[in-house]
């Protein structure tokens, strides 16, 4: 474990931090839980401001942090609630663009240091893209330090006017073997899903626009020509579920929508391939878990995926149905390539920062920003 906060080691009052989170991203939510656990263990007082559903899903209170329900909204009531929580904070750390913007509003007129972490590339088009650029400029100019989870995000923050932008060592908790039900074997999981004598493919993402599920359904039409026909299972819930289910039934696609699951680790461990048709996360949780679990990954070359996985996955152009379909078919027919990807994935995962690395870096930033200034 990395050292405790320098404030604690020098007998100063406990460092009080507020983590601001929207709760809409699995990657940033998992990161905040991991960060909170590490900070609490090192003597830092942590309050997480996030929607109640985020605490139910990630149990910030379970790792020793205080949780305060703050809606994912920039309305005056929500901003006022956040401002109240931040009143006695030594430092505020916001995760993601929208959470950061709310933190900027809440800290208006105060000198409290603000650390901002950008976990993904916010994707937008047209008028929304212009608004996004304005928000980004407002946030990075107000932030004391901006942490970007990829070099691309660091460059983006600097281009928007950040005073101090740094590359962040961000890790999510590594899944452990056995997961939630250690006695539940891979063969049992496959039997429950109906994939005993056929390949099992898995995708994990909310059923929202822009996640690439339409591409997967298009690809599934071609996969019907393979013998045996692979089964694609999609773990995740969202507003497009009914639309996708109708299409699956109308076209008789070999796809099952599983809804929200708490056993994703077991599903992944039982799969032959993990599929990531699109991700704007800088450090995709699914990509990390797939490589840790030695499950070959097929992914679109978007966001931070290339930097994250290197050569340890099959990467295809974004929104290229034929390329994605072909990559899956080739991998299913090439056991030697799958084994090579497993080994390369293990080596690539070993190069990623650990949770301890992440906490150590963040804590060093906190100490730097809250260290008493010498009198001049």
Regions found by a protein language model. Give the residues of each.
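Aromatic "clamp/platform" in nucleotide-sugar-dependent glycosyltransferases that forms part
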Residues: 260, 279
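Conserved acidic donor-binding segment of nucleotide-sugar-dependent glycosyltransferases
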Residues: 311-322, 330-336
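N-terminal strand-loop element at the rim of the active site
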Residues: 3, 14-15, 19-77, 153-156, ...
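A short helix/loop element that forms part of the nucleotide-sugar donor recognition site in Leloir-type
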Residues: 179-194, 346
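Short His-centered aromatic/hydrophobic patch
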Residues: 94-101, 118
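Short hydrophobic beta-strand element within catalytic cores of glycosyltransferases
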Residues: 296-299
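A short, active-site helix/loop in glycosyltransferases that binds the activated sugar's phosphate group
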Residues: 143-166
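A conserved mid-protein helix/loop that constitutes part of the nucleotide-sugar donor-binding site
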Residues: 26-37, 199, 203-222, 239-245, ...
């Amino acid at each position: 474990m990395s050292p405790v906060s320098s404030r604690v080691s020098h007998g100063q009052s406990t460092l009080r931090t507020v983590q601001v989170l929207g709760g809409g991203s699995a990657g940033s939510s998992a990161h905040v839980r991991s960060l909170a656990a590490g900070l609490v263990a090192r003597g830092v007082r942590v309050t997480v401001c996030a929607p109640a559903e985020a605490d139910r899903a990630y149990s910030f209170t379970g790792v020793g942090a205080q949780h305060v329900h703050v809606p994912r909204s920039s309305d005056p009531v929500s901003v006022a609630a956040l401002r109240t929580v931040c009143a006695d904070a030594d430092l505020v750390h916001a995760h993601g663009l929208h959470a950061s913007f709310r933190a900027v509003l809440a800290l208006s007129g105060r000198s409290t240091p603000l650390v901002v972490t950008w976990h993904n590339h916010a994707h937008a088009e047209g008028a929304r893209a212009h608004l996004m650029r304005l928000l980004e400029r407002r946030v990075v100019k107000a932030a004391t330090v901006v942490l970007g989870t990829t070099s691309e995000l660091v460059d983006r923050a600097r281009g928007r006017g950040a005073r101090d932008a740094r590359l962040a060592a961000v890790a999510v908790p590594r899944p452990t073997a056995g997961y939630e039900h250690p006695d539940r074997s891979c063969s049992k999981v496959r039997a429950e899903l109906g994939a005993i004598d056929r390949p099992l493919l898995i995708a994990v993402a909310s059923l929202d626009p822009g996640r690439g599920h339409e591409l997967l359904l298009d690809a599934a039409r071609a996969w019907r020509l393979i013998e045996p026909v692979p089964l694609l299972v999609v773990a995740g819930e969202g507003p497009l579920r009914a639309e996708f289910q109708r299409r699956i039934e109308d076209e008789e696609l070999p796809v099952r929508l599983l809804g929200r699951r708490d056993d994703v680790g077991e599903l992944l461990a039982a799969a032959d391939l993990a599929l990531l048709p699109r991700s704007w996360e800088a450090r995709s949780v699914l990509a990390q878990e797939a490589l840790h679990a030695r499950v070959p990954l097929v992914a679109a070359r978007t966001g931070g995926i290339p930097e994250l996985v290197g050569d340890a996955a099959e990467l295809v152009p974004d929104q290229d149905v034929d390329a994605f379909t072909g990559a899956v078919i080739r991998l299913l027919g090439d056991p030697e390539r799958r084994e090579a990807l497993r080994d390369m994935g293990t080596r690539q995962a070993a190069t990623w920062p650990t949770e301890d690395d992440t906490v150590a870096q963040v804590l060093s930033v906190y100490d730097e920003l809250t260290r008493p200034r010498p009198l001049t």
